[in-house]
Swiss-Prot record:
PANTHER family: PYRIDOXINE-5'-PHOSPHATE OXIDASE, PYRIDOXINE-5-PHOSPHATE OXIDASE
Native organism taxonomy: Bacteria, Pseudomonadati, Pseudomonadota, Gammaproteobacteria, Oceanospirillales
Its job: Catalyzes the oxidation of either pyridoxine 5'-phosphate (PNP) or pyridoxamine 5'-phosphate (PMP) into pyridoxal 5'-phosphate (PLP).
Catalytic activity line of the entry: pyridoxamine 5'-phosphate + O2 + H2O = pyridoxal 5'-phosphate + H2O2 + NH4(+); pyridoxine 5'-phosphate + O2 = pyridoxal 5'-phosphate + H2O2
Binding sites annotated in the UniProt record for substrate: 5-8, 63, 120, 124, 128, 187-189
Gene this chain is encoded by: pdxH
EC number: 1.4.3.5
Official protein name in the record: Pyridoxine/pyridoxamine 5'-phosphate oxidase
HAMAP family: PdxH (MF_01629)
């Protein structure tokens, strides 16, 4: 692996083109990735930390960027859910390789209200509703048991909507720091950090690559 290298050829990131609001800048980058039909343009690598300080990470899908923060949905009883309950400080990274772009978000995760979770769950495909309802996420389970539970719930609810399980819902990550990275030749990458100030405004600065 030591000989695997990627040279970047993009023009980089011009500070004057950055929005003063990093959440709006994040929307721009995600929208551009979606419009370019990149694979999984809304995928984030979410890092959480357990009560004893052990970090873990996994890929989840971002489902919204609002004025307050970034929203995703999951099982509250999963490992990430339990770790967020113990320590709501989280971080995630988004990487769009064809664009030589990376975004890092640091903040705290808060549960969204039940109405928002209900609304999104109802919008999911029927099969996704069923699998979410039966899955004891992050717990040991055999394939046979999972398939039997799917069959049982499909008989109980042969069509959508399936009731949203209480242990499934959304989180909104309220950011305190957002970084935007853009690859450039010779590893002289562009990197800008926004830090939220006490008055709610954002301060932007360039970081060395």
């Amino acid at each position: 692996m030591k000989d695997v290298r990627e040279e970047y050829h993009a023009d980089g990131l011009i500070e004057a083109t950055l929005h003063d609001d990093p959440l709006e800048q994040a929307r721009r980058w995600v929208d551009e990735a979606i419009e370019a039909e990149l694979p999984l343009p809304n995928a984030i690598t979410l890092a959480t930390v357990s009560a004893n300080g052990q970090p873990s990470s996994r890929v989840v899908l971002l489902k919204g960027i609002e004025n307050q923060g970034f929203t995703f949905f999951t099982h509250y009883d999963s490992r990430k859910g339990e770790e967020i309950a113990a320590n709501p400080k989280v971080s995630f990274t988004m990487f769009w390789q064809p664009f030589d772009r990376q975004m890092i978000v640091i903040g705290e995760a808060q549960k969204v209200d039940q109405e928002e979770s209900d609304s999104y769950f109802a919008s999911r495909p029927y099969a996704s509703q069923v699998s979410a309802a039966i899955s004891p996420q992050s717990r040991p389970a055999s394939r046979e048991w999972l398939e039997a539970e799917v069959s049982r719930l499909e008989q109980e609810f042969p069509s959508a909507p399936v009731p949203r399980p209480e242990q499934w819902g959304g989180y909104r990550i309220i950011p305190t720091e957002i970084q935007f990275w853009h690859g450039r030749p010779s590893r002289l990458h562009d990197r800008f950090r926004y830090v939220k100030q006490g008055d709610g405004c954002w301060q932007r600065e360039r970081l060395a690559p």
